[in-house]
From Swiss-Prot:
Keywords: Acetylation, Electron transport, Heme, Iron, Metal-binding, Methylation, Mitochondrion, Respiratory chain, Transport. One of its GO terms (molecular function) is metal ion binding. Binds 1 heme c group covalently per subunit. The modification N-acetylalanine is found at residue 2. SUPFAM superfamilies: Cytochrome c (SSF46626). Heme c binds at residues 23, 26-27, 89. This is Cytochrome c.
């Protein structure tokens, strides 16, 4: 598996489209917004997995204790259930490196507090 450092440059607008079609039904990025089926992703970068206040995470997410950054998200988004066995997230992942890079570009800007 290629790493984020080998990924193509991400495109914010393409990532926004991916978020709206693949992620927004379960997540929001809006500061102060409540959780949906999944946690609010605002402030995602630099945060440890399973620590968003007010959201009930699986033990797997809490115990993984990964700090979210471009590299960890790139690997996670390929196959969430393989990266964190036991996660509640039902999303199958993004197989294309460009899609993952685009989504990360969007999330990096859209989730900054």
């Amino acid at each position: 598996m290629a790493s984020f450092s080998e990924a193509p440059p991400g495109d914010f607008k393409s990532g926004e489209k991916i978020f709206k079609t693949k992620c927004a039904q379960c997540h929001t990025v809006d500061k102060g917004a409540g959780h949906k089926q999944g946690p609010n992703l605002n402030g995602l970068f630099g945060r440890q997995s399973g620590t968003t206040a007010g959201y009930s995470y699986s033990a797997a997410n809490k115990n993984k204790a990964v700090n979210w950054d471009e590299n960890t998200l790139y690997d996670y988004l390929l196959n969430p259930k393989k990266y964190i066995p036991g996660t509640k997230m039902v999303f199958p992942g993004l197989k294309k490196p460009q899609d993952r890079a685009d989504l990360i570009a969007y999330l990096k800007e859209a989730t900054s507090s």
